[in-house]
Amino acid sequence: MRLRNFYSALALSAAVFAGPLYAAAPAMAAGTISGGFDVGPGGFQGNFNPLAATGGFTWLVTYFEPLVIYDDKLENIVGDLAKSFEISPDQLTYTFKLAHAKWHDGEPFTSKDAKFTFDLARNGKTGSVFAARLASIASVETPDEKTVVIKLKEPSPSMLDTLTKVMMLPEHALASIPPEQLAKNAWWSSTPIGTGPFKFNKYVADQYVELTANPDYRGGRPQVDKLINRYFADPAAAIAALRSGEIQFTYVDSNDVSTFSSDSAFRVIEGDSFVVNYVGFNQEVPLWKDLKVRQAFMHAINRDAIIQSLYGGAAKPANCVYVADRLVPKAIDAYAYDPQKARQLLDEAGWDKINGSKPITILTYYNSPLVANVLAAMQAMLAQVGINIVPRTVDTPTYNSIVYKQGGTADEFPLIFAGLQNGPDPSSINIGLNEKQIPPAGSNIMRIRMPAVTKALDAALAETNPAKRDARYQDVCKATNANLPWGTMWVANRYGVASSKLENFIWTPAPAGGPYQAHPEKWSILE
């Protein structure tokens, strides 16, 4: 395509997204840290229920806690509410010894709470996103108040990774709520109690959440009195609030980094996102049934140009669902930019009769100027080969209500531009591609039913030999590259910017916000 058309599209999109929207600011007290902890990919989830959360764990883990958690490097899984754990040699029994902890209302945390939580998480009626992922659990036993034993039906090498996201919940506070009424119960945003270093104080709808220090936290009283999470409809407003000192942290896009990197008042934090961005082809829409159409889509997009021009080179092209060298075999199709080949494939598939130039909505929850520019670039490139996409951006709650809806109309989202976690454990990608994970069981929102992909994923999930595991996930890479359930685009770096006034502040650009050991009880701020 012509560069003039490409950059014209980018300029138009940037102009459309130029106006910031500001969230109301709460009064700042001494010893308060305020941040846009849910600014960025995924945005504000619209609820505080960790069983239903697909993101936002950076914030949720400040007051809820799991049994086990990743360290802040996302390299090892360590104990959190479990002071220790062990796995039997046959990998069928997981034994957790619990730490001495209290709920925020003073009641003790016991093994009964852990069993209660896992029973909820395994019950699809609760709206849990973990039901399918925990299906290999045969039983949860509580031999005493400080011991939890999970027994599996078959080995599950990804089980610990899943458990890092299952936040413990209080039986005494939730047992009276019927499972089918739990997902959207007012408790989550009014009087939730956890075991973490901060306690829920109040939520001002769509503006902010305020937490207060938990004086009885087992790791010691937090260094600050309050922790506030501000919500911003526009990332530009969060950046303005950071510069003015209203908040001390926010996520930023790669094209904003240069404005902070040379300013000593701020610290830029960079890391691998472990999220593959992709164009999802809704398999219940006839448009995408022919593989040649999906192949044409890939050849029509100049991913290298987008990465260099818009991401500033801070992304790696993805030719399958992974980019890590150990998981990507040689000799897979790179789907090089080739608009002539794209037109040829569309002609062979009979695209003029399938759809022709009719507009096709591409739905996304990414609301940043960067992604607006990315979609404008894609739109211009695809138009050159005869595919007419029209971007539609909505907030995360609206997006989820559309793509997870049962019995909905597939034409509402024939295409999506989204991202899904593909690490640190490569099994994370399973929930978006395995046919067993089609909603309500999981997050296969494109309703993908591709036997070769499911077979490769199942084999990888079942592999218990660490030496063979990477090879199994290379097979997943091959299957997704050959069958194109998604049009995989890239894995980009992520960035956060923190005020230099923050001390002992830990933020890791983790997929879905973690969780990981951030130790918010140690965060402090220079007055």
From Swiss-Prot:
One of its GO terms (biological process) is peptide transport. Probably part of an ABC transporter complex that could be involved in peptide import. InterPro entries: Peptide/Ni-bd (IPR030678), SBP_5 (IPR039424), SBP_5_dom (IPR000914). Belongs to the bacterial solute-binding protein 5 family. This is Putative ABC transporter peptide-binding protein BMEII0859. One of its GO terms (cellular component) is ATP-binding cassette (ABC) transporter complex. PANTHER family: PERIPLASMIC BINDING COMPONENT OF ABC TRANSPORTER. It is found in: Periplasm. One of its GO terms (molecular function) is peptide transmembrane transporter activity. Its main location: periplasm. Residues 1-23 form the signal peptide. It comes from Brucella melitensis biotype 1 (strain ATCC 23456 / CCUG 17765 / NCTC 10094 / 16M). It comes from the Bacteria. Keywords: Peptide transport, Periplasm, Protein transport, Signal, Transport.
